[in-house]
Each structure stands twice: as C-alpha cells, then as structure tokens.
C-alpha cells in the first residue's frame, strides 16, 4: 500500500509539472489592428543578383566620413551605395580567392554575417584610419581557433578580420589581405556568428569609443546541448567587447578593455572578452541615440522571441530561461515562477512563436531606435520585427515595458492605401520580377544618415526606405 502511495504522489507531481509546460505562454495575441502605424516606403536601391538568385542582404550601415551606405551579401560581396540610392558599386568581395577567406555560405544561416567600419575610418592619422571589420563563416579551419566549443561536429570556423584601405574614399577596396583578429570553431552548422558593431553614441574620449561589440551565438543544434551560454569560460552565447587596435588578448591580436565586467575579476575561468552572456542567437543589436541604451533582438528556441536591454555583465538567461520563462525543452517552457531569478536580465518585450500573425518559424530581428522627426509616426519608438513573416513591430522607447507582448504593436507598409507586411510587398515584387512569390521575408533593418530606416530582405534584392505617410489608426 505504501508503494501505491509513493506511485500516486510521483504521478501527481509529474502531472503537475507537465501542466505547467506550454508552447504558448502568452494568452492574448498581438493585436492585428490596435495601435497600428502605417508608413510609406520607397524602393531606394536594388542590389545585384548572384547566379540569378536575389542578394542575401544581412546588414546596411552608414559610413558618414565618406558619405556612403554599405550593404553586404552573405555570399561575400560588400557594396557601397550613394546616399541617393542611384549607384550601387561592389566595394569588395571577401570571397575572392585573393583574400583566402573562403566564405562558407552553403546554408541559409551561414556566410558573411556582419561588418563594421571603425569610427576613425576616415580620420587621417588616427589608429582606426581606413580600418573596417568583417565577421564571417569560413570553410578554412586554419590557423588553429582561439575559441573551441569542446564538442560538436567542428563544421567550420567563424572569423573576425580587419581590413585596411589605403584610401577610405576610393570606390573599391585598395588595401592588402586582411589581418585575422580571432577565430571561433563552430560545433554545428547554425547559430554561429551574429552582428558586430561600434557604439555610435560614443565620442572620441569616451570609454566606449572604438570598442567593437561581437555577437556570438550558442553554437547551434538546439537547446544549447553543450551548455555553453551560461559557461563564462566559453565564447558561445556571448556578446564580446574588444579593442581591435589593442594587443593584450591571449593571441596578441586585439585588446581587452579594462572595464569589461570580467577583465579584472582574478578568475582564470572567465573570459575577459565577455560583455554579456546567456544569449542564444544575437543577430541584431542597436543603441538608443538619446540615452545610449543598448538593445538586442535575440532569437528564441521554439517558444519565445526576445527584445532585451544589454548592460555590462548582464546574464540574459539562455539556456536556463527562454524569455521570461524557464526553459524546459525544445517543445515547451514552464509557466511556474516567471522572471523568478533576480540575477537574470529579462526581456523588455517578447512574443510567442505561436502568435497568429506569424509563421511557425519565427525569429526576432531588427533593430532601430527611432529618435528622428522625419517620420513623425515613428518618433520615440524601438523598431524590431519578425524575420520570416516580415512583420515590423514597435514598443515605446520611453517608459519601456517589463516583458510580455501586450505593449507590442505593428507597423504596416502603405501600398496605395493598403497596409501590408514586408512579405506581402516582396511577393508582389517577385511577381513583377518573374520570380515565384517568396514564402518568407528574411527581414533585416538598416540605418542611414539622420536616422533613416531601411528594410532589407533576401528575396527580391530591393532595399526599401521608410518615409512618412501620416497614415495611422
């Protein structure tokens, strides 16, 4: 009889735990109509196809010193674009055999991930003069990596390279082969690199000026099987912060800022490069030009997509937490004790992958904090979105929410008076181009001068610029 009681208690406990697991933790969906902002757009520029396939655009950024925008294709090209969008020029192809990079772009997530121009790129005589950086997946696995996962399949490496142009204003890159700063051995073929970038709100003399932030995903597979994101002795699932012009790293190829959170903790088991940890796939981050807040769009596993604030030493929770909820498995999170660990930085906003607005394969993307008055409808908003569905979302930049999706609202594109998602606009363009309509958008954001907001994708080669239409409801 005692055995029966033990069995009954065990079954009840298991049933209770199971009842707390869910794949849809948000009972109320994002409103399809309330608070919708409708903005107009123009087809700003067209990036060339490669072998008949649309450009796989990942990032667009402004290089104000030379008065050009730059955009990359994941297969290797880096293009410059005049501010009027009329001239698109291949500045560099990092996959050209002369450079020895050998870009690994065989899958949708792999390739030339990101790039960043040093803030002194156009400042003659400065340490960063002519320098820019690329973060790319490479077939080459030599030299030996600086960071290894300690498991997995060793599929390829992700490499940070420094390029030095002799003349920053030249139409094409005129420098020598790049210098390698760091190399990461990847355990799996997904969730590898992320974005790299300099803080645009930092000025010369500020502690953060000229320091490069590097997003490194958890290594892939699913659920962080090697438990790397919470391991402070691992590069995976982290945001690094380095001085690319320094030399006090272990390999001597870059510097480690003294004010990094683990740089002077006296612990040999923490990496001094780490700025924040507990991230899954940090593809997009951006800074608020008004107050310097750093935001991150972090892609969730199968349940929750996240928009978070990032601060020095922050633990964003993965793989113990997915959003505000304890991570159980790839099929569910726990509803028990949400946001229950005071040591974790939880999202300011998050949304569920089961939301009716979305496709099943959701992924948070972004990111732009809009503080301009050129598009009054978007003033003081944090803009982000969902990669596959092409949904553009916003939350208020002032008075940020404290998690959940209740504060999330939509931005639609004004197409002859009709509000449409980016995917719908792409599909119409595909028909015009003679292509089959895309099944997903692969949305990314880009930033231009004076707070311009661009929408990128991998499906039609068109860069779209948002403009005011004064249409909202």
What are these regions (language model features)?
Residues 294-301, 309-375, 379, 385-387, ...:
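Extracellular protease catalytic domains of secreted zymogens
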Residues 28-52, 86-106, 163-187, 208, ...:
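Blade-edge beta-strand/turn elements of extracellular beta-propeller
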Residues 151-161, 227-247, 308-330, 472:
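Predominantly five- to eight-bladed beta-propeller fold
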Residues 268-308:
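Repeat-solenoid scaffold signature
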Residues 82, 250-252, 308-309, 315-331, ...:
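Extended hydrophobic/aromatic segments used for targeting, binding, or gating
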Residues 14-16:
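N-terminal signal peptide c-region/cleavage motif recognized by signal peptidases
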Residues 2-10:
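Sec-dependent signal peptide recognition
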Residues 20-223, 284-286, 292-300, 360-399, ...:
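Acidic, Gly/Ser/Thr-rich repeat motifs that build Ca2+-stabilized beta-propeller blades
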């Amino acid at each position: 009889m005692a055995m029966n009681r033990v069995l009954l208690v065990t079954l009840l406990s298991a049933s209770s735990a199971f009842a707390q697991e869910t794949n849809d933790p948000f009972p109320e969906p994002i409103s399809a109509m309330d608070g919708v902002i409708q903005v107009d757009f123009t087809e700003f520029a067209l990036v060339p196809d490669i072998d008949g396939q649309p450009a796989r655009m990942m990032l667009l950024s402004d290089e104000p010193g030379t008065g050009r925008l730059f955009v990359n294709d994941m297969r290797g090209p880096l293009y410059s674009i005049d501010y009027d969008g009329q001239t698109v020029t291949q500045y560099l192809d990092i996959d050209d055999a002369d450079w020895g990079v050998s870009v690994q772009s065989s899958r949708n997530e792999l390739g030339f991930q990101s790039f960043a121009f040093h803030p002194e790129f156009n400042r003659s005589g400065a340490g960063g003069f002519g320098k820019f950086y690329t973060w790319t997946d490479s077939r080459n696995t030599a030299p030996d990596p600086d960071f290894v996962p300690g498991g997995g399949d060793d599929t390829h490496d992700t490499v940070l390279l420094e390029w030095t142009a002799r003349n920053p204003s030249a139409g094409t890159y005129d420098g020598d082969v790049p210098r390698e700063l760091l190399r990461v051995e990847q355990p799996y073929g997904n969730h590898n690199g992320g974005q790299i970038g300099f803080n645009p709100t930092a000025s010369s003399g500020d502690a953060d000026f000229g320091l490069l932030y590097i997003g490194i995903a958890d290594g892939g597979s699913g659920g962080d099987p090697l438990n790397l994101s919470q391991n402070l002795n691992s590069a995976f699932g982290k945001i690094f912060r380095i001085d690319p012009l320094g030399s006090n790293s272990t390999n001597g190829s870059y510097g480690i800022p003294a004010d990094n959170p683990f740089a002077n903790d006296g612990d040999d088991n923490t990496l001094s490069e780490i700025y924040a940890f507990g991230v899954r796939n940090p593809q997009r981050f951006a800074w608020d030009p008004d107050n310097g807040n750093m935001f991150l769009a972090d892609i969730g596993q199968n349940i929750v997509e996240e928009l978070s604030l990032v601060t020095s030493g922050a633990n964003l929770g993965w793989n113990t937490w997915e959003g505000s909820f304890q991570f159980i498995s790839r099929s569910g999170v726990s509803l028990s004790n949400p946001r229950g660990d005071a040591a974790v930085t939880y999202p300011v906003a998050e949304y569920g992958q089961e939301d009716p607005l979305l496709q099943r394969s959701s992924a948070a993307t972004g990111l732009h904090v809009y503080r301009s008055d050129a598009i009054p409808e978007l003033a003081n908003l944090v803009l982000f979105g969902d990669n596959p569905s092409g949904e553009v979302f916003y939350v208020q930049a002032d008075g940020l929410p404290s998690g959940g999706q209740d504060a999330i609202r939509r931005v639609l594109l004004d197409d002859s008076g009709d509000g449409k998602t980016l995917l719908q606009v792409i599909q119409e363009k595909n028909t015009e181009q003679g292509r089959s309509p895309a099944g997903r958008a692969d949305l990314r954001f880009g930033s231009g001068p004076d707070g311009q907001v661009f929408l990128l994708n991998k499906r039609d080669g068109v860069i779209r610029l948002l403009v005011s239409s004064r249409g909202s409801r």
